[in-house]
């Protein structure tokens, strides 16, 4: 398979996001996607084996964007709680902006029975947060003795689930800032040193 960072790959992926968002996965055709991308149909198959193969790529693209946005707001000297606050804020912002794509990814990955692909896609995000947690443990910002690998996954899942429930499930009995503050407070009480 050609390098995924090529311009054609990105064009096809962005075109797929637009076409699938507009028409839905079932009604979107590969012809529609390549026409929007300005590439030949054969080029599509250099990168993707089928239309369903787009879904993990779209999910990975969105997750990479999320992590890049979080890292882009960091300077490297922030304490754990500042990083967590930024992670929460960016997750909510990206979930609001891309809720249709998130729903598409969930449905597509469920259809393809590829939940194990989620773990592979999430691995860089989990590893990044795990390192942040290990640094926080060393700096006595969080409770010692926690399993940083498990804690990283739990934090990411909790924050994403809450953002998705707010924007996709419309559980909006409070203002979004209340939700973000509650997650932050819950995690600080759970992980903070006394």
Swiss-Prot record:
GO terms for molecular function: DNA binding; DNA-binding transcription factor activity. The keyword DNA-binding applies. InterPro entries: Homeodomain-like_sf, HTH-type_Tx_Regulator, HTH_TetR, Tet_transcr_reg_TetR-rel_C_sf, YvdT_C. Residues 29-48 bind DNA. Coiled coil: none annotated. GO terms for cellular component: protein-DNA complex. The keyword Repressor applies. It comes from the Bacteria. It holds the Pfam family TetR_C_26. PROSITE patterns: HTH_TETR_2. Keywords: DNA-binding, Repressor, Transcription, Transcription regulation. Residues 6-66 form the HTH tetR-type domain. PANTHER family: ACREF/ENVCD OPERON REPRESSOR-RELATED, TRANSCRIPTIONAL REGULATOR, TETR FAMILY. This is Uncharacterized HTH-type transcriptional regulator YvdT. It comes from Bacillus subtilis (strain 168).
């Amino acid at each position: 398979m050609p390098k995924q960072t090529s311009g054609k790959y990105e064009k096809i992926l962005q075109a797929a996001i637009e076409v699938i968002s507009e028409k839905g996965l079932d009604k979107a055709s590969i012809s529609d996607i390549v026409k929007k991308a300005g590439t030949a149909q054969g080029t599509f198959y250099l990168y993707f084996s089928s239309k369903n193969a787009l879904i993990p790529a779209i999910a990975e693209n969105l997750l990479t964007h999320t992590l890049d946005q979080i890292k882009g707001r960091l300077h490297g000297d922030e304490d754990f709680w500042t990083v967590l606050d930024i992670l929460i804020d960016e997750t909510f912002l990206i979930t609001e902006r891309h809720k249709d794509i998130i729903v598409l990814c969930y449905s597509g990955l469920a259809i393809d029975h590829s939940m194990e692909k989620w773990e592979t896609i999430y691995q860089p995000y989990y590893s990044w947060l795990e390192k942040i947690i290990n640094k926080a443990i060393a700096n006595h910002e969080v409770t010692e003795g926690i399993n940083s690998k498990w804690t990283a996954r739990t934090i990411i899942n909790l924050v994403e689930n809450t953002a998705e429930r707010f924007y996709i499930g419309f559980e909006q009995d409070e203002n979004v800032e209340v939700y973000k503050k509650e997650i932050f407070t819950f995690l600080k009480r759970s992980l903070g040193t006394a």
